[in-house]
């Protein structure tokens, strides 16, 4: 229980540090990421807008606290006078039980959690009484997962972010003009990382050599870069890593992507994971997505 005698001290300014999260990315050694109050506030309000989160909602925390502070929702839900139900460990049967018991309307989870939900046995599942809204992030999801989740009564939105940006900085916001597309095309679009998240100053796919945005042709690969108040203060006691990540006034994500003509961003790979064969850049993510659609792959 909390300390009844605790007295909150107002921060001296909004740039004062509020938390320290750790990330390793693909480079191995963990780096401390320093968050400030302003960025945490912007992420919280941005999520409420992007996800159309209502006041007094019941939220299921599935994302671990050590993953970007649970994607920032420990701040978002209190702001909305909501109730947080904490899942201590990934237990699919428990997820369905908690949704029913607490009338859960929203939760977030990585694609692997969604795979576990759609692969659950009949004894583990419970029929949903109403639509449950889900955010997925942490890894590019195979497009087929959206249809599988929809069949169970979930509505999934794909978002993208990093520990260094407090969480989400892109969202695959749905456009009504896509409603008439066939299911495969819809699911393909839902797997995109999307467009700029609310309260994010700017997110672009930029050629790291020229520092110019790539054309919106869905083919030219660049690096996702971010700027604004939702970028960390820096890496804790690591000026060299901070300066490298913030070169030219942008935070360099290390994720390679293209921009489609409609402005929606789609990740192709991590810069360290791209496969080069015969002079061509081959996306390991596209290979994984193709395999996931095969009927022999569960």
PLM ranges: what are they?
Residues 2-22, 29, 52-58:
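Conserved pre-ATP/AMP-binding loop-to-beta segment of ANL
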Residues 18-42:
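Conserved AMP-binding A3 loop
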Residues 41-58, 66-106, 120:
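Conserved AMP-binding/adenylation subdomain of ANL enzymes
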Residues 107, 228, 233-234, 244, ...:
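AMP-binding/adenylate-forming catalytic core of the ANL superfamily
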Residues 138, 161, 194, 255, ...:
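Active-site glycine-centered loops adjacent to acidic/histidine catalytic or metal-binding residues
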Residues 79, 101-109, 118-188, 201-202, ...:
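Gly/Ser/Thr-rich phosphate-binding loop
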Residues 196, 202-225, 261-262:
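Conserved beta-loop-beta connector loops within the AMP-binding
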Residues 17, 23-26, 59, 65, ...:
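Conserved S/T- and glycine-rich ATP-binding loop of Class I adenylate-forming
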